[in-house]
Every structure is written in C-alpha cells, then in structure tokens.
Amino acid sequence: MVFMTIENVRQEIENIDRELVELIAKRVEFADDILKYKHQANLPINDDRQNDVVIGRAVSIATEKGLDSTMVKQIFNLLIQMNIERQHELSGEGNLP
C-alpha cells in the first residue's frame, strides 16, 4: 500500500479538477460544432429530447459508479444550460431561452 500525504491527495484532486475543466471546455467546443448543424438544418437550439438522453446516460453511469445520481443530474443540467446559453450567444440571441 502506498502512503500518500494530504498534500499528495490534494495535488491529485487538483489534477483531476484541471482535467474536468479541460473536458468541459472540449464539450463546449463540440456543442459549438453542433450549433452549426442546427443552423444548417434550421433546428432550434434547445432539444429537450436530446437533453433527456444525455441526462439519462449520465444518471445511468453515476448509478453504476455508486455516485449520487441526483447530484450528477444537477451537474449535467448545468452543463447543458451552459451550452444552450453559449449557443444563443453565438447565434446573436444573447442568453434568451
């Protein structure tokens, strides 16, 4: 068993936090790409059915990993809302729903 000091553990958490933010940024970039497809197909920015699929998938994974699925659902709702607001901004619509 490897003994880690509290500083080591905090450093590992900091590394994970950095990775999480980088993954969020990558997710936003892909959402920007999706906006282009939505514009070409004349689709609305918000797609409740797709949002439900994304949240359902996240909740399922959270359950498999023994995580609080309610909290994971809240996190993914925030991620989706962030993407929706960004897509509105890129469309010149500000953050209107």
Descriptions of predicted regions:
Residues 1-97:
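Domain-level signature for soluble enzymes in the chorismate/prephenate branch of the shikimate pathway
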